[in-house]
Amino acid sequence: MKEREKQMDVLRGIGIILIVLGHAAFPYTHFFYLFHLVIFFILAGYFFKEEYVKDKVCLKKFIMLKIKRLYVPFVIGNIICVLLNNVFINWKLYDNINHNYFTVKDIIVNIIKIILFRGNTEMLGATWFLPILFFISIIYALIEFAIRNYKKKTREYIQIILSIIFLGIGYVLIQKNINLLGIQIFTCYIFFNFGRNFNKYKIKSNNVINCIKFVISFVILVILNKYGDIELAKNEYTNILYYICSIVGYRFSRNNYLTSYKCS
């Protein structure tokens, strides 16, 4: 059995902490937003395996796994929040004074939207990325399944080209102010593919090299943080080149001393 990569567990934990801080009015939220959610898209791609798409049975198992891990938690969590919406208002848990009580019709409509992945609740607004990650994972797997008989390099080139095309489509739509539901599927697909290739071609380095990478990544992020931003939830970013800083942010998170520390 392949040994569990504890370093990636730590990195996932760091990502979760950054998301919590980002939604808790932490002073450096703008800095975290440059890369905190991207970590999860990259990690999802990092753990994608060829065995998931070697035949129809494996592909079906992979899809069911994603339904279990992404779709079901999203639906259950948000439906609970819909049902408790009026209770939350009475308990004054919302800071929005204009938040409305739900009628029976409102509850039904919102539950249907949640089941169809077409909306979530204010209380669990941070779960917006789960549908995006779900569809990216499925689309990536379907494409890999379709090209599974091609040579390894050919498959990699196809995915790289598609990633760039998807990013271009997303960017054009944004520039034309066409903010479609789920448009982040186009713009975040490239991160999933990056994670996959990072796992394939990862290079082991010592603590000195990791420290150098950490410092360089941090400096780049600090500089970019002064001149622009990224808001994946709204699919907004200063420039398409700012996607580079998301990958730099991943390197920054991965090369810090916490993730470089080897647990016994």
Residue ranges and their predicted role:
Residues 174, 187, 203-264:
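Alpha-helical transmembrane segments and terminal signal-anchor/GPI-anchor hydrophobic tails
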Residues 1-167, 176, 211:
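Membrane-cytosol interface segments of multi-pass membrane proteins
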Residues 48-66, 71, 181-182, 240-243, ...:
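Cytoplasmic juxtamembrane interface segments
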Residues 38, 69-73, 77, 163, ...:
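Hydrophobic alpha-helical membrane-embedded or membrane-associated segments
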Residues 159-200:
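Loop-centered beta-sheet repeat module
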